[in-house]
Amino acid sequence: MSYPQFGYPYSSAPQFLMTTNSLSTCCESGGRTLADSGPAASAQAPVYCPVYESRLLATARHELNSAAALGVYGSPYGSSQGYGNYVTYGSEASAFYSLNSFESKDGTGSSHAGLPPTAAAAYYPYEPALSQYPYDRYGTVDSGTRRKNATRETTSTLKAWLQEHRKNPYPTKGEKIMLAIITKMTLTQVSTWFANARRRLKKENKMTWPPRNKCADEKRPYGEGEEEEAGEEESREEPLKSAKSEGHAGKDDKELELSDLEDFDPLDAETSECELKTPFQSLDSGPERIPASSDGPGTGKEASTTLRMPLGTAGGAVMDGDLERARNCLRSTVVVPDSGAEGGPPACEAKLTFAQAGAPPNLETKPRIWSLAHTATAAAATALSQTEFPSCMLKRQGPTGVSATTPASSPAVTAPSGALDRHQDSPVTSLRNWVDGVFHDPILRHSTLNQAWATAKGALLDPGPLGRNLGAGTNVLTTPLACSFPPTVPQDVPPAGASRELLATPKAGGKPFCT
């Protein structure tokens, strides 16, 4: 086995441990191996033998036992100053000649000439992917092993490219790779540098390119070779700034519109902007008095009108006024019960109605479930119309129900039945108005009902005069809880003392209404 890098051959025999001189000068017999003569020679005069590296001892390892190997070759090899470490063997130093340090002929100097490839790999990790690139152990551009810091020379290349592409400072993927190879930087460093440069120019108001989306990185609206002069850059900066300010102003206007929409009131909006609105439609500004149609009696046309009010801004004030007018009507009913001969107080002659959008004013159809309430309401209106109540206390009925009043029966009450007056309210409202009119205090204080109470109380003691006073077809409640006959309110009852213990109520359909 020859080692040409040392300059002379070595054999694989045990004599490879010796130099070109014989070992007879330091050993008793030249035929003995170093393994046999080593321990014997150590007991005699000391000799100095050079320490050989592990590469030269690899082939003769089978002839050396562990004790001899540790005693002779246990000292490690030092640094690169040559084979200078010696072990004392008990012989004269001039008998041995140390080998000079050998260098590799290729002159790379990456590893020592005597070290095997495995030992060299322990000190210098070998990367096959990086060996073919001449950029200081960088295999690919984005290798994460070592990152080169950006220097003035590398950034000058990037600045030059940025100066040439002021119109569009967005390098493509290929241009980034090219710049990374030239500047010996990674691809991430190049992308970060360009992003920071664009941000810095924006902050300094030196933007010479239109803003673009990040997703359109590969689209280049301008050519790479186009350059821009200083005057053109200045002229380009002005429209960009003005466009920016206009954009901000438009954005503010849009935000103001959105804030206005938050306070949007459907009642105040115009019909042209929003199609679907509240079911109540706004009429003309201010309340409007509409005379009744000609199908009612003549006295009703002059005495009563219908008040239609808009639901706009002045609706609250008009409604408050109508409520106050209704309260005055109730007060006048209690204080002056016999004022119906003059037609009632003028404040009670106006009726507040709402015109519902999409519904005809003369709608007469009702669900069947409210037929009982409708009948009871009609009967109550018939009974109450024969008393001296003003018109504001009566519920106006359509042509299908019983007429509210007639001029012959009571000249104090006028009830025109025009198209707007025939408009039916909600059945719940009709029933509630009937209950309120029959059972609540303002009506109970009326003199006619008080006469009925007194008459009913007298019927408990003497039913004969009661029958004569009320007539043949009239029944009166004789017990507070049991109701077995339909009572009605008499038309002509003589006055009597006030009493509220018993209640005479109107009834329709054979079923009495009791409290």
UniProtKB/Swiss-Prot annotation:
> Subcellular localization, per the record?
Nucleus
Listed Basic and acidic residues bias regions: 214-223, 237-257
Which CDD domains does the UniProt record give?
Answer: homeodomain
Where are the residues of the annotated region Disordered? 205-258, 278-307, 398-425
Question: Keywords in UniProt for this one?
Answer: Developmental protein, Differentiation, DNA-binding, Homeobox, Nucleus
**Per UniProt, what is one Pfam family of this protein?**
Homeobox_KN
Q: Which Gene3D superfamilies match?
A: Homeodomain-like (1.10.10.60)
GO terms in the biological process aspect are:
cell differentiation; establishment of animal organ orientation; heart development; negative regulation of transcription by RNA polymerase II; regulation of transcription by RNA polymerase II
Q: Which residue windows does the record flag with biased composition (Low complexity)?
A: 399-419
Q: Where is the composition biased (Acidic residues)?
A: 224-236
The GO cellular component terms are:
nucleus; transcription regulator complex
Tissue specificity annotation: Expressed in the developing central nervous system, skin, and vibrissae, but predominantly expressed in the cardiac ventricles of the developing heart. Not expressed in the developing metanephric kidney or adult kidney.
Q: Which InterPro entries match?
A: HD, Homeobox_CS, Homeodomain-like_sf, Iroquois_homeo, KN_HD
Report the DNA-binding ranges.
144-205
**Taxonomy, superkingdom:** Eukaryota
GO MF terms on file?
Answer: DNA binding; DNA-binding transcription factor activity, RNA polymerase II-specific
Give a short account of what the protein does. Answer: Likely to be an important mediator of ventricular differentiation during cardiac development.
Q: What family does the Swiss-Prot or TrEMBL record give for this protein?
A: Belongs to the TALE/IRO homeobox family.
Q: How does it assemble?
A: Interacts with the vitamin D receptor VDR but doesn't affect its transactivation activity.
Descriptive protein name:
Iroquois-class homeodomain protein IRX-4
> What is the scientific name of the source organism?
Mus musculus
| Name of the gene | Irx4
